[in-house]
Regions:
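Short, intrinsically disordered, low-complexity terminal/loop segments
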Residues: 1-2, 269
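Bacterial N-terminal signal peptides that target proteins for export
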Residues: 2-10
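C-terminal motif of bacterial Sec signal peptides marking the signal peptidase cleavage site
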Residues: 19-22
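A sequence/structural signal for flexible, mid-protein segments enriched
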Residues: 24-269
Length: 269
């Protein structure tokens, strides 16, 4: 039984060329005998909420992606710098929300979930903001030889290793399922012009594109990177089904992310 990925993950081409198999351990699971596990997915940003924490239960790998919601949980997020805690109310089954605050860059946040006599926690530190200067476009040839138009994210990586990024594309208002992640291990302090190779939906001139850029912490990056490895989208694939890395304690799957956010909207040219 594993957390079936809701997204198809694509690591940026510049990162793919430099990767070596990670040493981090992932848990190999018996798909027939593993018990159901809590699945927690939540994010806060530097933009005022509302924010949502989604809590569900894992299902057998062979079943459809219909995750049973977890109701009646107590959910809080605490700013570890100023000590303020924020409660999340259950708006619908398994969906917990608040609009009480905006995250502060460089602050550490702790998520606590109490459900069915079990406590789950996660810690995420919100990085400083990196400005997405512009989005341009480049013609490329895909792995299957098809010509495609890709967005290029242009931004200045701050000096100092340990900067991690995630990008999400919306084309004509529709979110593209690919999630792109990037780290600055080989490009520290440089001006980045990163093409977002997208094999699930091709940009066309005249489309409306919204590109979101998130500055994420290492644990968030490792979650999506390990998910890419497990699903084979990074050029490496787990020998047997496994769960992606998580920053959650208590035996839960998923992730909690505190990140900064900015976006660019434009017409594809």
């Amino acid at each position: 039984m594993i957390l079936k990925n809701r997204y198809k993950i694509c690591l940026l081409a510049g990162l793919i060329a430099s990767l070596v198999p990670a040493c981090k351990k992932v848990i190999q699971l018996d798909l027939r005998n593993a018990s159901s596990m809590a699945v927690i997915e939540g994010e806060i940003t530097n933009i005022p909420g509302p924010y949502q924490i989604k809590i569900s239960r894992s299902i057998p790998y062979s079943e459809d992606n219909n995750f049973p919601p977890v109701t009646g949980a107590t959910v809080t997020v605490k700013d570890s710098i100023n000590g303020i805690s924020y409660g999340f109310d259950e708006l619908s089954p398994g969906i917990y929300s608040t609009n009480q605050f905006a995250g502060i860059p460089k602050h550490m946040y702790k998520l606590t979930v109490n459900s069915d006599d079990q406590q789950y926690t996660a810690i995420s530190t919100m990085p400083g903001t990196v400005h997405l200067d512009s989005v341009t476009f480049a013609d490329n040839t895909s792995f299957n030889g098809k010509k495609e138009l890709n967005a290029v994210a242009n931004f200045q990586d701050p000096p100092g290793l340990g900067n991690y990024y995630r990008f999400i594309e919306y084309i004509n208002g529709r979110q593209i399922p690919n999630i792109f992640v990037f780290e600055d291990r080989l490009s520290d302090g440089r001006y980045i012009q990163e093409a977002l190779y997208n094999d699930s939906a091709y940009l066309q001139k005249g489309d409306t594109l919204q590109l979101n850029m998130y500055c994420i912490d290492k644990s968030d990056y490792e979650y999506f990177f390990s998910l890419a490895q497990i699903t084979g989208n990074a050029g490496f694939q787990s020998a047997s089904p496994a769960n992606p890395n998580t920053n959650l304690t208590g035996g839960a799957l998923g992730y909690f992310s505190a990140h900064t956010y900015n976006e660019v909207r434009l017409i594809v040219y």
